[in-house]
């Protein structure tokens, strides 16, 4: 306690000397860019991450993941800290880019499974070699039940990639 009082009362000691990394004001920040998948069009650039988060509704964790790993956001957009020399600046407004992202989110989310741990499977008929692809085990079980088979999801899980027949089908992840 005495040490705290000493530092608080000492006039030349400054407690506000913390340097903020990635300064949110953008004064010392590196520029960030949003390109199309092949990097030929630059849709947006800013020195602040918060602009991408607030303006376009991209979650900060999602933004950082795609920025750091170099993966494509919505399988279409590339975030980068480097300016690509051959990229042309888009003439779209910020509102148009935000609308484009909203439309792509709806389209992309329709193609996703509802549960992140869902397993996409293929059932292959042993006799005809006909393949039936399903986005989840549940839909594969419904298919088997509609074919008058007493199907069970637990048993189907055990048969994935084992080549053990289940009601005339083999089950594989895809």
From Swiss-Prot:
<dbReference type="GO" id="GO:0005739">
    <property type="term" value="C:mitochondrion"/>
</dbReference>
<keyword id="KW-0378">Hydrolase</keyword>
<comment type="similarity">
    <text>To endonucleases of group I introns of fungi and phage.</text>
</comment>
<keyword id="KW-0540">Nuclease</keyword>
<dbReference type="GO" id="GO:0004519">
    <property type="term" value="F:endonuclease activity"/>
</dbReference>
<protein>
    <recommendedName>
        <fullName>Probable intron-encoded DNA endonuclease aI3</fullName>
        <ecNumber>3.1.-.-</ecNumber>
    </recommendedName>
</protein>
<keyword id="KW-0404">Intron homing</keyword>
<dbReference type="InterPro" id="IPR003647">
    <property type="entry name" value="Intron_nuc_1_rpt"/>
</dbReference>
<dbReference type="GO" id="GO:0006314">
    <property type="term" value="P:intron homing"/>
</dbReference>
<comment type="function">
    <text>Mitochondrial DNA endonuclease involved in intron homing.</text>
</comment>
<keyword id="KW-0255">Endonuclease</keyword>
<keyword id="KW-0496">Mitochondrion</keyword>
């Amino acid at each position: 306690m005495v040490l705290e009082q000493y530092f608080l009362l000492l006039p030349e000691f400054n407690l506000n000397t913390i340097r903020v990394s990635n300064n949110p004001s953008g004064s010392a920040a590196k520029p960030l860019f949003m390109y199309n998948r092949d990097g030929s069009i630059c849709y947006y650039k800013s020195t602040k991450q918060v602009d991408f988060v607030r303006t376009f509704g991209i979650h900060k964790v999602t933004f950082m993941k795609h920025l750091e790993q170099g993966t494509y956001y919505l399988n279409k957009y590339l975030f980068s800290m480097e300016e690509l020399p051959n990229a042309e600046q888009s003439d779209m407004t910020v509102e148009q880019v935000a609308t484009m992202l909203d439309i792509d989110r709806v389209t992309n989310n329709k193609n996703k499974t509802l549960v992140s741990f869902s397993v996409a499977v293929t059932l292959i008929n042993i006799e005809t070699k006909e393949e039936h692809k399903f986005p989840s085990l549940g839909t594969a079980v419904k298919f088997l039940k509609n074919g008058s088979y007493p199907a069970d999801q637990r048993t189907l899980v055990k048969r994935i990639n084992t080549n053990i027949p289940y009601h005339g089908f083999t089950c594989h992840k895809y």
